[in-house]
């Protein structure tokens, strides 16, 4: 049995940190219905859809993201009015929190909450924790959406140096439609 003990000093301890940087392309073929089997799970409540990398009934399927749409009062949409308002309010409570008066804040275009353009209609994409782990690296997010003959690319340009910290859930970057990230031009 050992009877000799060594005291560890502060210089005897080494701390290392490894950042995992991986690009995860989610191609349009997964969400467009290109494959014969369904990768998109539609729920009876019609509040959101879940997207998988393989047919969702397969044991190999991994959940990639959920997508939903929500709006606040004053929006023109009528289909499932209460459900869509509940989605907006739920996401706003979690992501932007409450005003000092106790009201749910609206999503803000530039993230400042003190004036500016408020988003009344929002599309929410909730990525699986399996994919994003602890965070998406700031300045690396790009989303390209095709609709018919038009295409739009959204990215968090400059977010590694210009991000917001006023969310109850942590840090976030503003999405822009061009590489010129000028104040007040964010899309969400």
What is each PLM-predicted segment?
Residues 1-188:
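Long, position-biased, composition-driven segments near the start of the mature protein
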């Amino acid at each position: 049995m050992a009877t000799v003990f060594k005291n560890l000093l502060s210089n005897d301890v080494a701390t290392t940190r490894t950042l995992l940087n991986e690009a995860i392309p989610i191609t349009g073929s997964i969400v467009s219905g290109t494959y014969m089997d369904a990768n998109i799970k539609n729920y009876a409540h019609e509040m959101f859809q879940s997207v998988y990398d393989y047919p969702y009934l397969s044991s190999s399927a991994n959940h990639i993201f959920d997508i939903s749409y929500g709006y606040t009062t004053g929006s023109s949409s009528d289909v499932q009015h209460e459900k869509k308002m509940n989605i907006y309010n739920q996401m706003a409570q979690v992501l932007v929190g409450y005003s000092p008066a106790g009201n749910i804040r609206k999503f803000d275009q530039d993230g400042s909450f003190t004036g500016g353009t408020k988003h009344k209609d929002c599309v929410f994409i909730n990525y699986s924790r399996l994919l994003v782990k602890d965070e998406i690296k700031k300045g690396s997010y790009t989303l390209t959406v095709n609709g018919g003959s038009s295409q739009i690319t959204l990215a968090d340009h400059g977010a590694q140096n210009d991000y917001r910290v006023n969310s109850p859930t942590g840090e976030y970057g503003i999405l822009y439609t061009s590489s010129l990230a000028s104040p007040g031009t964010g899309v969400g």
